Amino acid sequence: MAMPDPLTEVDRAISEIRRGAVVRVYDEHNSLLMLAVDALSADYLRLLTQSGTKMPKLVMTGTRVNLLGIDKSDRPVSVLSHPEGISLDLIEYLANPLAASMMPPSMASLEVKDADVLEQSCVTLAKLARLLPAALIVEANATADIPAVQASSIRSYMTIAAHSLTQVSEARVPLENAENARVLAFRPRDGGIEHLAIIVGDLNPAEPVLVRLHSECFTGDLVGSLRCDCGNQLRGAIGEMATAGSGILLYMAQEGRGIGLVNKLRAYQLQDAGFDTVDANLQLGFDSDERNYLPAAQILRLIGVNRVKLMTNNPAKVTALGNCGIEVVERVPHIYPSNQHNDAYLKVKAKKSGHLF
């Protein structure tokens, strides 16, 4: 019997948990049923309980657990359980910071332990699905007839998807500030989300190419949000490349520093409640930056570019791209004036994320 394709089985699992269904996550030793907290419903919770062998447990990032004051260890992922089971109210309070206005349920008798690799994979799957990084899990019955995904496939998904990227289309697209421009689309083997490369002018791969890694930003790029500087950076980068004669802007499907648009809007709501851009992500249970730069590096290699002048204010991008095998010969500052809505945001990026302005 042929082994399942890792990308295909992860994509199917993502589709299932995004609609609130239960999936089975397994390795060579154990098998868990998983239900994403973000899509929790009474019917599927009942199915999870009936299909398992024990009471469901909650698995979530150590970051979120620490911020709740439940545990102060350095666990990357924690498993929370209660002898009588975790109530729906408690699940919502623990996993969703936007439920913090509720009266906190009693957390007496709540037990916390390290998550093993299989349990950690459930949180990773929720992140891949762009859901809150929390899941209900229960040991699976051997006969459970539920869509299944290997934990090893979840862990390797990002790497395999990046290496499977291929160019699927290209068109000449004259732009406002760069009439000589082309847009190339790249898709992973599983038919997942596409990334784009905007090539301005005629490249000379023998020389370091001016490159901007730009994470898609619906609010800033498309509708002109003043909460960030993304729109200015997008259009400014294209104009600077046209002035320089050539360049590549990689438009990466990594909204909200990799957490997705829905979670970014949640982070905005938390910012309105007083958290800064970094702490809002942490409150949701994410890292301050969830982006993976391997897809960007792979696209550059497919275009034939291995040496770049990177247009960024973020030294972490320079390091990350270098770790992915692309030589960054120069960091090119990319600074635009702030406004009353994003001034604090930019200052936090400088103070907490090391951006250089």
Language-model features and meaning:
Residues 1-357:
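Catalytic domains of riboflavin
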